[in-house]
Amino acid sequence: MHITKMHGLGNDYIYLNGLEGAPEDLPGLAVRLICIRPGRDGDFTMEMCNADGSRGAMCGNGIRCVGKYVYDKGLTRKTCLTIDTDAGPRVLELQVRGGRVEQVTVDMGIPALSPAVSVEAEGETYTVWPVDVGNPHGVVFCPAPEAVPLERVGPILEGSGAFPQRINVEFAAARTRERLDVRVWERGSGITLACGTGA
């Protein structure tokens, strides 16, 4: 089995070319794994597993790496791709220079917003704003994301009974009209350096 390690904004994944066969028990490998298979309706299919072995419907940084992977490995020469995911198809635009992908943008679709939910964790009440972009997120606006004990609060919010599917959690503070500071707890993976769908 040949693998490739890639990262998008610091989120690293192991990529497995499943176009010619791959293990059926992907969650059993228990790593942050993305398997690229033939497309159902699109050009390719992305199957994603979190570090704990749970299946992820969508990963923004992961799907950008899929675009780079399939182009740089010569599996396609298209610069506009449709990737099938468990959250539905996503369209990628690849910016190519000198035969290599330099940047990938993804149309994530329109996020679905829900009313805020209050959740208790570590003696504090957090106002969590549910947002769904193909996978569930909970955004908590706070003055200092860096001060939140993310390793303790993250798993409590992720697994709260208010969110039966579990959620990715982003603690965010608006610093200017153009800048947010964000810390991320991803369901099934824990603290990560970034989150494409959470952005």
Annotated model-derived regions:
Residues M1-R100, V139-A199:
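A glycine-rich beta-to-alpha transition motif near the start of alpha/beta enzyme domains, typified by
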Residues T4-M6, L81-I83, A116-G123, W129-V131:
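Short acidic-hydrophobic surface loop/beta-edge motif
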Residues R100-M108:
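Short, solvent-exposed secondary-structure boundary/capping segments
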Residues P111:
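Alpha/beta catalytic cores of group-transfer enzymes, especially the acyltransferase/condensing modules
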Residues S114-V117, E124-T127, I156-E158, N168:
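Glycine-rich, charged/polar anion/phosphate-binding loops
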Residues E120-A147:
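Internal active-site segments that recognize and position negatively charged phosphoryl groups
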